[in-house]
């Protein structure tokens, strides 16, 4: 399953109103570290399909959402459970570190 692409129009429905775990990758096209993390995020999306919804939010396209969650550096990963923030990770992290967010 590919990651869900988030924007101002679908963030509430896809993340805040979602039941279960949702991992949001806050990134930007110009961000080198974001590009380094992207394959790992895609791998997580495939491996945890049906268990964790994985979404990507381009901060340049939805700056207000990023700011409302205190995203000052990217990449930032935020794990939501039933619409509430559970954990936050800033910077490039390993697959194991991402998996540890919900284990």
Q: What is the predicted role of each segment?
A:
Residues 19-21, 38-57:
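Conserved helix-turn-beta segment immediately C-terminal to the redox Cys motif
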Residues 3-22:
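A short beta-strand-turn-helix
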Residues 2, 7, 27, 53-55:
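Conserved Rossmann-like nucleotide-binding pocket used by diverse enzymes
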